[in-house]
Amino acid sequence: MFFNSDNNPIAESVYVFMSIIFPQLKETDIEVIHTDLTEDNVFGWTLINNDQNEIEIHNDLSERDYVTTLIHELVHVKQNVHGVTDDTIREGEAYELENTLADIYLTGNSYRMLKQR
C-alpha cells in the first residue's frame, strides 16, 4: 500500500512509475511524509517502522528535486525489501539511478498527462 500524507499527485505518479520498474515496491507498505527537513540538511530519507517504509521528504523542493529525491528514496525501499544493508552499496545504487529515472519520468507520458490536469 502507498500512502502520501499530502495526497500529492506527483508522489502517486512517481510511485506508479517506480512500481513498473521495481514491482517489489508493491510488496511493502510505503508512507510518504512531507515535512520541513531544513535543520537536518537533507532532501529526504527512508526509515523502517515495523513493516512499513516511511519516506520523509522536504516540503519545499523544486519539482525536479522532489521527483529525484522520491525516486532515490524508493530505490532504498526496494533495497529494504531485498535486505540490502551495506550503506555504500545502497547509496551507490540510489545515486546511480536517481537522475536517469527522473529524466525518464519527467519526459514520459504519465508526467505530461498529470501536468495537463
PLM features: residue spans?
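Membrane-anchoring alpha-helices and their flanking helix-loop junctions
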Residues: 32, 36-39, 80, 99, ...
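Catalytic zinc-binding patch centered on the HExxH motif and its immediate surroundings
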Residues: 31-54, 64
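Hydrophobic (often cysteine-bearing) scaffold residues that line and stabilize catalytic clefts
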Residues: 10, 67, 90
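Short pre-active-site segment immediately N-terminal to the catalytic Zn-binding motif
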Residues: 51-70, 84-86
